[in-house]
Structures are given as structure tokens and as C-alpha cells.
Regions:
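Single-stranded RNA-binding surfaces
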Residues: 1-204
Length: 207
């Protein structure tokens, strides 16, 4: 809150544990050609559902041609380890929907460390604000192979503030990667839904 203006609001449901946006190191437990999907053991009783379109090319078998029309059994194998993020919570008898395209949300940006084609500025940002942010983004230093999206909270922020948030997210991704390399699947890596901890980290880092 700044004066009478609310700039940021974080809400967390305390009645049940949410796993949406959590990141895990999982293992392909079953490949289903008929569904064009795989099931992933990521540490819970009901295995997660990973559609073909949510599998990053970094996990494709050696020799696979990304340009050709591949079948899922030609891309991945049972027992293969993958880093996944929960896109949708478990519902009824259905397991959680997973993706290997990771998104890390900061205060002003969303970092997509393995999706260079994604990125840009939130659709809710229009007019002069959009133009100014586009200019600010030109000065950002982002590793190749990664993408970012500017959130609505980024309106009015310059290159320096956006770069600060980007650096924070890059360090977070590095930490997640290092933890993944040390651990065997299934293994929990990161929980985004801890609102208090995430908000406190951002506030402290920006003082």
C-alpha cells in the first residue's frame, strides 16, 4: 500500500495445502501413446499428467528431430527424470496437470528459464505504459534460452528495478537447478504458494 493506493495483494488459502506452481523433480512412470501424454511420479499418491505439448525439447531423446511430427513414445521414456511444475491442482480422481515449461513469478517479472519463445508484456498493460516498459526491457540482461513477461506491477518501473527482479529470479532458478542435480526423483524442489516468505524476501531485497 502506498498512501491510499493498493499496489500489490497476495492471498493464500490456509484451509488446504495448494500445490499449484510448485516445482518437483519427477520420474516418468508411464507413457500413454493413445493420450499423447505421460504420467509422472512427483512424490504424491496420484501421479501427475504431462501432455506432449508441455514437454520441453531439452527432454527429447537424442536423435529426435523437433521439426518432425513426433509421437510421445519417440520423445521420452519411462524412468526418465524431468523437472515439472504443477499447472492445475488434482481434481476428483484426476492427477495434477504438469508442465516442464517452468515459470517463476517475481514482483515485477515472470521468468521462463526454458522457454525463450515466450515473453513480452502483460496484455493488461496498454498505451504509454506499454511503450515505456518496452523501452525499459531493451536494457535488460537476460541469458539466452530464457524468456520474461512483465507483470502489471512492473508499470512505472525502470530498467534497474526490472533487472533487480530478474537477477533475483535467475538466482532462484540456479538454486532450484542445483537442488535438482543433487536429488533423486521424486523430490520436492520449490513452493511458490508460501506468500509470507515470498513477499518478505522481495521486500527485504528491495530495501
Amino acid at each position: 500500500v502506498d498512501g491510499q493506493n493498493l499496489y500489490d495483494l497476495d492471498i493464500e488459502n490456509r484451509t488446504r495445502q495448494q500445490i499449484k506452481s510448485n516445482i518437483y523433480k519427477g520420474k516418468i512412470s508411464r507413457v500413454e501413446p493413445s493420450l499423447e501424454a505421460a504420467f509422472v511420479d512427483y512424490g504424491v499418491e496420484r501421479h501427475g499428467f504431462l501432455p506432449m505439448k508441455e514437454i520441453s525439447k531439452i527432454y527429447f531423446k537424442k536423435g529426435s528431430s523437433p521439426s518432425s511430427r513426433l509421437k510421445i513414445q519417440e520423445v521420452i521414456s519411462e524412468g526418465q527424470e524431468v523437472i515439472v511444475q504443477v499447472e492445475k491442482e488434482e481434481r476428483g480422481n484426476k492427477g495434477a496437470a504438469l508442465t516442464t515449461y517452468i515459470s517463476l513469478a517475481g514482483r515485477y517479472l515472470v521468468l521462463m528459464p526454458n522457454n525463450p519463445r515466450a515473453g513480452g508484456i502483460s496484455r493488461r498493460i496498454e498505451g504509454d505504459d506499454r511503450t515505456e516498459l518496452r523501452e525499459a526491457m531493451k536494457g535488460l540482461s537476460i541469458p539466452s534460452g530464457m524468456g520474461i513477461i512483465v507483470r502489471t506491477a512492473g508499470v512505472g518501473r525502470g530498467t534497474e528495478e526490472l533487472q533487480w527482479d530478474c537477477n533475483y529470479l535467475l538466482q532462484l532458478w540456479k538454486t532450484i537447478n542445483e537442488e535438482s542435480q543433487k536429488a533423486s526423483a521424486p523430490h520436492f524442489l520449490f513452493q511458490e504458494s508460501n506468500v509470507i516468505a515470498v513477499s518478505y524476501t522481495h521486500l527485504r531485497a528491495h530495501e
